Amino acid sequence: MSKFLLNRCIRDLSPLTVLKDNLQQTAKPILNYYAKNAASRGIKVLFISYETLEKEAPEGIDCFLYATSWEKVKSLKELYEHISSWRTQGKQHIVMIDTINPILNTSISSFTMFFGSVLALGSICFLTSFHKDVTLENYPSYLPPCEVFLDFTSTCTVSLIGMQHLSVEHDAKMRSLPNPLLEELQDDKIISLLGSNCETAIVLHVEFRKKSGRIIKESCVLKNGKLEPYTPFEETARGPEPADNQIDFNVSFNLNVSEKERKERDKVFLPYFSAQMVGSQHKSSFVDEGTIIYHADEADDFDEEEDADEDLLI
């Protein structure tokens, strides 16, 4: 039994698996991995292309179909007829679509009918990629964002990020610096960042939705065509904070407080504490917050006949 969730999705034919890619990381290495894994299991693979040339298709596929041509774009009905005629009874099948964006841009109702009709044939599943950077002009505004829509429609979603970009983000975080990838992407002149579309090491964040609705999450690394466990970057551990009596401020005088001085300091009762106590005990009192109450001592000698401005007279 496979220990990776992605391999289980291939073995059990997860109905709809969506690979979320962008300009910084393409999903082609995962499509190649799926095709090789399916071929080793004896699963037939049909590759439907909207933007991929036949010579660039993954190795191990059984059939290649162009969904577009110079004259027209094949309708979903034509694709369904081709899939139903290609399907072999008693075999397992995977239909790969290099991008689902054109289908989502036509009609959402047609999208659901197409996938539902094909899945009803039995022993078949879909694997497709969704370009997050591509804007869908005809996507209905009353529906949730397309990525959210696919999260609830698909049974398995895979988010991709290159290991090199992940390392750069981690280094910036450890140095308390802003993410350099986001800063560079804000520049309109930069289309693709250095280290984009990595093929040697890709981090996959897999989310599988069971029939009960519960989501199972897993992270792994596709490294040189093989899946490996993913170990997150560890943050630098901070050392223990020194005690008060161990702090060295590198000054010529002593800043530490002795035990006797600390006890005498605790006995000091400042006037504004009385104002807070009076204000809390008598809410209707005239005392406002911040008012300082002063009680005269016996040593205070006030002369009512004394003129305070007498010393100012010349």
From Swiss-Prot:
Keyword Disulfide bond: no
GO cellular component terms, semicolon-separated: cytosol; elongator holoenzyme complex; nucleus
Gene3D superfamilies: P-loop containing nucleotide triphosphate hydrolases
Pfam family for this entry, one: Elong_Iki1
Annotated localization: Cytoplasm; Nucleus
Record pathway: tRNA modification; 5-methoxycarbonylmethyl-2-thiouridine-tRNA biosynthesis
Keywords tagged on the record: Cytoplasm, Nucleus, tRNA processing
Signal peptide boundaries: none
Entry keyword Nucleus: yes
One record GO biological process: tRNA modification
Function: Component of the elongator complex, a multiprotein complex which is required for multiple tRNA modifications, including mcm5U (5-methoxycarbonylmethyl uridine), mcm5s2U (5-methoxycarbonylmethyl-2-thiouridine), and ncm5U (5-carbamoylmethyl uridine). The elongator complex catalyzes formation of carboxymethyluridine in the wobble base at position 34 in tRNAs.
Similarity section: Belongs to the ELP5 family.
Subunit and partners: Component of the elongator complex.
Official protein name in the record: Elongator complex protein 5
Organism encoding this protein: Schizosaccharomyces pombe (strain 972 / ATCC 24843) (Fission yeast)
Gene field: iki1
